[in-house]
């Protein structure tokens, strides 16, 4: 998705900041219907991947800290 200009890796500061931002985006999706294609918390919470591909808004949430595969 990055090569299509439909994704970004967000860097919020510390790993704890990344976890907090990930949860905030996830909760905003659940409570307010925020749409995206993928939301991924990378291992070690180094960054958050988020993508938005029109026509493919599956709202897939992956926490690689909980499940590294």
Where do the protein language model's features map onto the residues?
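Catalytic cores and adjacent binding grooves of peptidoglycan-active enzymes
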Residues: 2-6, 12-69
